[in-house]
Amino acid sequence: MIELRNVTKTYSAKQGGVLALSDINLRVSAGEMFGVIGKSGAGKSTLIRCVNLLERPDKGSVIVDGQVLTTLSSKVLRQARHRMGMVFQHFNLLSARTAYQNIAFPLQLLGKNPTEIRKVVLPLLELTDLTAKINAYPSQLSGGQKQRVAIARALVTNPTVLLCDEMTSALDPETTHSILQLLKNINRELNLSILLITHEMEVIKTVADRVAVLDQGRIVEENDVVSLFKRPKTEIAKKFTHSSIKVKLPEILRNRLQKTTLDEGYALLRIDFTEHTAETPIIDEFIRKFDLQVNILQARLEFLRDDSIGMMLVALRNVKDTLPQGIAYLNEKGLQVEVLGYVSADDWRYR
């Protein structure tokens, strides 16, 4: 279990203090995979480094497995850190040591004998699918294999908590997918509490149970992953979820959008589907009820856990008088609708 209570962190700078984290409250339950997402500079790395006190908060408490780390002496804190594994974006492997030796290194520092070390390292090589690479040096490993070594090394002290700091950012999409599947397997087999930070919503969507959205050092939204996708409340959460579903207005139309309604032209809408609304013919009913001309620009349906979510971009022609009633109808049916803007008939004709 991980808990942050009222954690604040400020860095000193020539022009005054820089607030990295402000009054952070966060709880990761035992066995849970919890994601923190935010843009670059949001404070993600500072947050995760506060968990094991690589960065010490200016105020607030950090609690891991019921132990208040912020009150511990240096000696006791070092012992407590053995229960916390950490994986970074960069692998930080020792180039002159094999995969086995890199994984074993923390145990050697703890004074374990070779027999004890072997009993721990061999199962981890198997768990991370590295048995065939036991004697390989980092220069002989792919990026994904290096990250697997780093993960095994983080697990070698039998931690209850695993901290992952942008661990897939340096990997290609296929390798990222395999590493995330490994992380899910580790969570299932070892029942670890996993806290991961990322700027990629695809990572959150793939592995996290719950997610917090971090913006300018503050948690602005927190929810289970499915609920966040269904009903994002903040603008930054909406941007993350919309970018993940990969439905985007063509640039030629974005450049021609106007904010005011037009007598002759098109209204461009983004319509979000969730739950049963993704599986019922609501748009067909909408077209018939209001006798509309509808152009579907883009549409996508995805399945997340046991739910379906989707998004559609549509252009409605000459709807100045009926648009408010149409949006109210769609909202009543459980759809979320956002008016992106308006395009004149001439601009539409020459798109």
From Swiss-Prot:
Membrane topology qualifier: Peripheral membrane protein
Catalytic class of the enzyme: translocase
Sites where the protein binds ATP: G38, K39, S40, G41, A42, G43, K44, S45
Coiled-coil blocks: none
InterPro entries linked: AAA+_ATPase (IPR003593), ABC_transporter-like_ATP-bd (IPR003439), ABC_transporter-like_CS (IPR017871), ACT-like_dom_sf (IPR045865), MetN_ABC (IPR041701), MetN_ABC_transporter-like (IPR050086), NIL_domain (IPR018449), P-loop_NTPase (IPR027417)
Presence of the UniProt keyword Cell membrane in the record: yes
Enzymatic reactions: L-methionine(out) + ATP + H2O = L-methionine(in) + ADP + phosphate + H(+); D-methionine(out) + ATP + H2O = D-methionine(in) + ADP + phosphate + H(+)
GO cellular component, one term: plasma membrane
PROSITE patterns named among the record's database cross-references: ABC_TRANSPORTER_1 (PS00211), ABC_TRANSPORTER_2 (PS50893), METN (PS51264)
UniProt keyword terms in alphabetical order: Amino-acid transport, ATP-binding, Cell inner membrane, Cell membrane, Membrane, Nucleotide-binding, Translocase, Transport
Subcellular location: Cell inner membrane
Entry's EC annotation: 7.4.2.11
Domain ABC transporter: residue ranges: 2-241
Gene Ontology MF term list: ABC-type D-methionine transporter activity; ATP binding; ATP hydrolysis activity
Family designation: Belongs to the ABC transporter superfamily. Methionine importer (TC 3.A.1.24) family.
Binding partners and assembly: The complex is composed of two ATP-binding proteins (MetN), two transmembrane proteins (MetI) and a solute-binding protein (MetQ).
Function: Part of the ABC transporter complex MetNIQ involved in methionine import. Responsible for energy coupling to the transport system.
Protein name: Methionine import ATP-binding protein MetN
Organism: Coxiella burnetii (strain RSA 493 / Nine Mile phase I)
Gene: metN
